[in-house]
C-alpha cells in the first residue's frame, strides 16, 4: 500500500486500441493503493468512459495525471464533456466518490473504503 503522495503522468493516444491497456494500468494503481475488486471495476469503467469520450471528440491524445495519497486515487484528464455526453457523466458520477468537470479537464476522485 502507498503511504505517501505519488504522482504518475501518462499521455495516451485517443484511440480505442488503448482502452484495455489504460484499464489494466488503472487497475494496477488501484491494487497497489489497496482498493478492493468492486472499486477497481468502478475505476476501470470510469477510465474507459473518459477515453471513449476523447475518441468521440477526435482528440489526438489524452493526458492523464494520477495522484495516490492516503487511501485516495485522484485522476485528472484533459477530457471535456458536453450535453451529448450526459449518460457518460451519470455513469462516472455514480461510480466515483467525487467528479468535477469544466472546459479544460475532468477530475475524478476515488476514496478507499475503510
Predicted regions and their residues:
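Conserved beta-strand-loop-beta-strand hairpin that lines the nucleotide-binding pocket
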Residues: 1-7, 52-114
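Bergerat-fold GHKL ATPase/HATPase_c domain
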Residues: 1-45, 56
Amino acid at each position: 500500500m502507498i503511504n505517501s503522495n505519488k504522482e504518475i503522468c501518462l499521455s495516451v493516444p485517443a484511440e480505442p486500441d488503448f482502452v484495455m491497456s489504460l484499464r489494466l494500468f488503472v487497475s494496477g494503481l488501484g491494487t497497489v493503493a489497496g482498493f478492493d475488486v468492486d472499486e477497481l471495476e468502478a475505476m476501470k469503467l470510469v477510465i474507459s468512459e473518459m477515453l471513449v469520450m476523447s475518441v468521440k471528440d477526435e482528440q489526438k491524445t489524452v493526458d492523464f495525471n494520477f495522484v495516490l495519497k492516503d487511501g485516495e486515487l485522484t485522476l485528472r484528464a484533459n477530457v471535456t464533456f458536453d450535453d451529448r455526453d450526459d449518460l457518460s457523466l451519470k455513469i462516472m458520477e455514480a461510480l466515483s466518490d467525487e467528479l468535477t468537470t469544466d472546459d479544460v479537464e475532468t477530475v475524478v476522485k476515488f476514496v478507499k473504503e475503510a
